[in-house]
Design a protein with these regions (language model features):
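Acidic-and-aromatic substrate-binding clefts and catalytic sites of carbohydrate-active enzymes
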Residues: 22, 121-128
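An alpha-helical appendage that flanks or caps ligand/catalytic pockets
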Residues: 1-111, 140-146
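Active-site-adjacent beta->alpha loops and helix N-cap segments on the catalytic face
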Residues: 1-5, 125-130, 134
């Protein structure tokens, strides 16, 4: 895509939207991820995703494919959990781990050309606080916006 855009005198920038679950240990982070969905049954999850306006988008369909190919705990790759996509449409992945693991994952995405991140978590304020205290101080970044 970058080469195609350059052929037309344009420059593309890439961003990534995901959730973050950061805890002191990886086991704690994974346990919290599991607890988020502990009361969700498959039928309810299917209904939530089906009624979303974006349920037929290519991105959402690709996330569903990744979720189906994930291991039994929902991890499609190291520290990338697709389980959150069982409960919602759209952003269906979460970086899950210790502060250093989350930081390493974000840096790996930056190395692949991702320049902007839209990060969230559940509950929003609590996860934002954990990320701000444990990951953000170690992450090189430009101006932050709300």
């Amino acid at each position: 895509m970058t080469k195609r855009a350059a052929a037309h005198g344009r420059t593309l920038k890439f961003g990534y939207r995901c959730h973050v679950i950061v805890r002191e240990t990886e086991d704690e982070a994974r346990a919290y991820a599991s607890r988020l969905l502990s009361k969700l049954d498959a039928e309810t999850g299917d209904a939530i995703r089906a009624k979303s306006l974006d349920s037929q988008s290519v991105g959402v369909q690709r996330q569903a494919q990744l979720r189906e190919s994930a291991g039994s705990e929902g991890f499609v790759e190291e520290n990338l959990w697709t389980g959150i996509g069982r409960a919602r449409s759209g952003c269906g992945a979460a970086i899950v781990g210790t502060p250093d693991q989350v930081l390493a994952k974000l840096k790996a995405y930056q190395a692949e050309g991702i320049e902007a991140f839209i990060l969230s978590g559940y509950p929003h304020a609590a996860e934002c606080d954990l990320f701000a205290r444990h990951v953000l101080p170690k992450l090189e970044h430009g101006p932050l916006t709300l």
